[in-house]
Amino acid sequence: MKNEEYKKLSINEFTKAAGRYESNHAGIYEMCKKDYPDILAELEKEPFRELLDAGCGPAPMISLLAEKYPDRHYTGLDLTPAMIEQAKKKNIPNATFVVGDCENFPFENDSFDAIICSMSFHHYPNPQAFFDSVKRCLRPNGRLILRDVTSDNKILIWLMNTLEMPLANICGHG
């Protein structure tokens, strides 16, 4: 599957899931709460003012971080407009949400002190493009905090990239 085809599939499947992504059945918010302590521990090592959540979905991680650090600014980026609509409904006053591609950040150079990417990296068909965007948009001494699933098994990766989203929409995300 070509990169653009995969991105269209992602948008289609995550649009279907957007309204129920954080429901009790889906468990995404609970999964984010499990990642949150590790991400928070990394963020607490160095101060930050501007944070990007790449692949933010409906912004469960930004919601948690904004409660802890209400004096910081957060930007959420997601490819799926319906996910950004859900994030905006949370009315987080110190957050901005942008529809865009995590393989080509729509931001100025040196925009962020920290970039987090939690459980979305495996959906990026061109990982190097993501890292190039991170390098361009991180300020000097900025940090990338990346949490995701991984495997060396090419069949498992293919199954995850091809079947995960349609199955998750049938069975529930999380």
Residue ranges and their predicted role:
Residues 128-140:
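A short glycine-rich, Lys/Arg-flanked "PGG" loop and its adjoining helix->strand segment in the class I
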Residues 1-46, 60-64, 83-86, 145-168:
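Conserved class I S-adenosyl-L-methionine
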